[in-house]
C-alpha cells in the first residue's frame, strides 16, 4: 500500500509538562472544558459537539518564553436559540445570539479554563490575563457542524491537529486513514 513512504516531523519543547507547545495545550484545555460544559447541560445549553480553538501567545523576544495569552479564538457549534420574529430581523437575531455566545465564552468558559489549570497546578493559568483579544465564531452562525458542515476527507485541520503553527508538518491528514498505516513516527535527532 501507500504506507511505505512519508515525511514525518515531531518535536518536544519545555513550555508545558506535556512537552508540547503552550498554544496547543491551551487550545486543548479550552475544548475539553467546553465539552464538559456542554455535557453538564447547566449553562450554555445551546452548545453542540463541533468546536475548534486557537490560542496565540506573546513571547519574550530575548528569552523566547511565553509572556501572556494574546488572542483566543473559539468556534463552537450551537442551536439557533434566538430566532427572528417578534420584531427581530434575521440579522438582529443572529447578532444577539452571537453576542450571547461571546459573553458566555468570556464569563463562563475562560474562567473555568483558568480554574482548571490552577487546580492542576499548571503555570499556563498565569498566562491568561484580562487583556486578551477574544474572537468567538468569527465567521458567524455555526449551526451545521460535524460531517455535514465539513464534508469530504480532504485533510482539513492538519495543522491544528498536530503542533499548531509552531512545527513542520509532513502534509498527511488524520481523517480517512487506514488504521494499519503509520501516522506518526518518533525519532531522535542525529
Model-predicted segments: where are they?
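Short capping/connector residues at structural and topological boundaries
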Residues: 12-16, 147-149, 158, 179
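Residue-level detector of conserved catalytic or cofactor/ligand-binding positions
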Residues: 184-190
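Active-site pocket-shaping loop/turn-to-helix segments
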Residues: 176-183
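Alpha-helix capping/termination and helix-coil
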Residues: 113, 164-167, 187
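Glycine-rich, mobile lid/loop segments that gate access to catalytic sites or pores
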Residues: 1-144
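A glycine-rich, aromatic-flanked flexible loop/lid motif
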Residues: 149-175
